[in-house]
Design a protein with these regions (language model features):
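Sec-dependent N-terminal signal peptides of Gram-positive bacterial secreted proteins and lipoproteins
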Residues: 4-23
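A domain-start/cap signature at the N-terminus of enzymes
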Residues: 21-69, 105, 174-177, 182, ...
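Gly/Ser-rich "nucleophile elbow"/oxyanion-hole loop immediately N-terminal to the catalytic nucleophile
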Residues: 59-65, 121-173
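Alpha-helical segments with a strong preference for the paired helices of cellulosomal dockerin domains
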Residues: 296, 302-342
Length: 342
C-alpha cells in the first residue's frame, strides 16, 4: 500500500502538479486507518515550521476532476511535533467521520506544537482582546498564521484539482477557536465551518461588546456550531453570546446546536450525526478569495534569501523529483512567471 501510494503520488506530481509525500498515518485503529494520510511540513514566512497530514481520495487519479477540501484544526490535546495526534487523538472524530463518509474530498490537518496554541487563552473569538487584536485585519498568533499560510499555499499550488467553492473547515476546542478566528480574518474563503466548543468563559472571556465588534465578519459564511451545556472548560455562555451577536447583526447562515448534558469533549457526539456531514458538503461558496496566500515574493522564495530567482525554481524541481511535499509544478510555473515579470 505504502509503495503503491508513493509511486502514484510521485507520478501525479510530475504530471499534474499535485502535492505529494507519503508517511505512516495514525496508529489508532478506530480512528484514521494506517497509511492513508500522507506527511508534509511547511516553513512559513515567519520562520516557523508546521507539520501537517493530508489525504488524497482514491478517485484522485481521475483526470479533470476537482475535489472539495476538508480542513480540521485540532484542540490542545493534539498538540505536538509527532505529526500524528492531529489525526489520531480524541478531538479528531469528525475528521474520521468525513474520511469514512461517501464524500470524496482532499483532507488536511496541520499541527501546533505543545509549546504554543492556536488561540491565546485570554483572546478567544468574541472577547474584547480578540476584537482589538483583529481590528486591522491581522492576528498576532504565530502558529495560526503559519498554518493559514500553509493552507493558502496548499490550495493555490493544487488549484488544478481543488474545487475552491467547497473549502470546508472544522475545529475542536482551541481548534474551534482557531476556526472562528480564521473566518473572521478570511470571510470569503470558506464554504462551511463547524466549530465545536470553540469559545467561552471564563477563558476568552467572551463579552457582548467583543462579540458585537466582530459579528459582521460572520454574516456571509454558513456556520454550524456546537457546545455542551455542561462544558466545564469553556462555558457555553461564551458561544451563547457570540451566536446572539451574529444573529442580532442579521446573520441568517448560522446554526447552533446545544448538546444537552454535554461536557467539553462533544466531538464524538457530533461525529455520529450524519446530517452534519451532509450539511457540510451541500454548502458552496461563490465568492472565494484565497486571502490566506502570502505575497508572491514570500511564497516563491524557496531558499528564503529575499529574492525570487532561478535558484528557487531549481530547488522546487529538485524537491519534486525527490518526492517532497513542499512544491508542485504549478509553483515552479508561478516562479518562472514571477521572474519574467520582474
Amino acid at each position: 500500500m505504502k509503495k503503491h501510494l508513493l509511486c502514484f503520488l510521485l507520478a501525479a506530481t510530475l504530471l499534474t502538479g499535485a502535492a505529494i509525500g507519503v508517511g505512516a498515518a495514525s496508529e489508532t485503529a478506530n480512528l484514521v486507518p494506517k497509511n492513508v494520510f500522507a506527511k508534509g511540513s511547511y516553513t512559513a514566512s515567519n520562520g516557523l515550521t508546521i507539520p501537517y497530514r493530508y489525504y488524497l481520495p482514491e478517485s484522485y487519479k481521475a483526470s479533470g476532476k476537482t475535489y472539495p477540501v476538508f480542513i480540521h484544526m485540532h484542540g490542545n490535546g493534539s498538540r505536538g511535533t509527532d505529526n500524528a495526534k492531529q489525526i489520531s487523538a480524541t478531538g479528531t472524530e469528525l475528521n474520521t467521520a468525513v474520511f469514512r463518509s461517501d464524500y470524496d474530498c482532499i483532507m488536511i490537518a496541520p499541527q501546533c506544537p505543545a509549546s504554543d496554541m492556536w488561540i491565546a487563552r485570554d483572546a478567544y473569538p468574541g472577547s474584547d482582546k480578540f476584537a482589538a487584536d483583529i481590528a486591522d485585519g491581522t492576528l498576532e498568533r504565530a502558529y495560526l498564521n503559519a498554518a493559514m499560510e500553509l493552507l493558502g499555499i496548499f490550495i493555490e499550488d493544487n488549484r488544478d484539482v481543488i474545487d475552491t467553492s467547497r473549502i470546508y473547515l472544522s475545529g475542536a476546542s482551541n481548534g474551534a477557536g482557531a476556526a472562528w478566528a480564521m473566518v473572521a480574518l478570511h470571510p470569503h474563503t470558506f464554504a462551511a465551518v463547524v466549530p465545536m466548543a470553540g469559545t467561552g468563559q471564563p477563558q476568552g472571556p467572551v463579552t457582548e461588546a467583543g462579540a458585537a465588534a466582530i459579528a459582521a465578519r460572520y454574516l456571509d459564511t454558513p456556520i454550524w456550531t456546537f457546545h455542551g451545556d455542561a462544558d466545564p472548560t469553556l462555558l457555553i455562555k461564551g458561544t451563547d453570546v457570540l451566536v446572539a451577536a451574529i444573529k442580532n447583526a442579521g446573520g441568517t447562515k448560522l446554526e447552533y446546536t446545544v448538546i444537552e448534558g454535554g461536557k467539553h469533549n462533544i466531538w464524538p457526539t457530533v461525529a455520529k450525526m450524519p446530517e452534519v456531514i451532509d450539511w457540510i458538503f451541500e454548502q458552496k461558496n461563490d465568492r472565494f478569495e484565497n486571502t490566506m496566500l502570502p505575497d508572491p515574493a514570500v511564497r516563491l522564495d524557496a531558499n528564503r534569501d529575499g529574492n525570487v530567482d532561478l535558484a528557487d525554481a531549481l530547488i522546487m524541481l529538485q524537491s519534486i523529483a525527490n518526492g517532497g511535499a513542499h512544491y508542485t509544478l504549478n509553483t515552479v510555473l508561478d516562479t518562472l512567471k514571477f521572474i519574467a515579470a520582474k
